[in-house]
């Protein structure tokens, strides 16, 4: 993972991307017991190119290939780690990128989503493994329930908390 983080920091420093934040299982592993995963989910802001309304990952992939990455399916593999580049696809993810926290991975600085944003995005995604992850955060006391509750209400995720976690967003 070290090579992947160094490459991401390099393309940030060179201006290919403005910033990034890691989400998914890798980010969750900074808070709760390690979770098996095969890739690194990297979220960032993107805008369409001048001549197109479509978003293109090509400039990012080109820059990462110059740093030793190779494209495989929807990933760019750096070292042994498949990196999935994901545009900020919702206001919740945009907020998660903006409010991401800086952490150390060994001697490398990187940014990850807050525990509360990871949980809110997991609730929004709605897969069983995501609900399990939210329950793990809560059971291990790694999430501020008040902050999570505010996200749940702001992004209208109350039905997810009631149906899956037996937790009403009215609870603090």
Report residues per predicted region.
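Compositionally biased terminal segments of proteins
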Residues: 1-172
């Amino acid at each position: 993972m070290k090579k992947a983080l160094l490459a991401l920091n390099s393309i940030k420093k060179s201006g290919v991307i403005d910033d990034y934040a890691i989400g998914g299982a890798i980010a969750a592993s900074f808070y709760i017991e390690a979770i098996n995963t095969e890739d690194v989910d990297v979220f960032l802001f993107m805008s369409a190119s001048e001549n197109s309304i479509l978003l293109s990952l090509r400039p990012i992939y080109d820059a990462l290939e110059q740093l030793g990455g190779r494209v495989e399916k929807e990933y760019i593999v750096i070292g042994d780690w498949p990196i999935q580049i994901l545009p900020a696809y919702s206001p919740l993810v945009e907020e998660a990128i903006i409010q991401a926290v800086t952490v150390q991975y060994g001697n490398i600085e990187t940014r990850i989503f807050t525990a509360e944003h990871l949980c809110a995005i997991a609730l929004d995604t709605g897969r069983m493994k995501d609900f399990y992850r939210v329950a793990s955060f809560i059971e291990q006391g790694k999430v501020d329930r008040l902050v999570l509750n505010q996200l749940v209400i702001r992004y209208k995720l109350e039905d997810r908390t009631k149906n899956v976690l037996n937790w009403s967003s009215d609870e603090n």
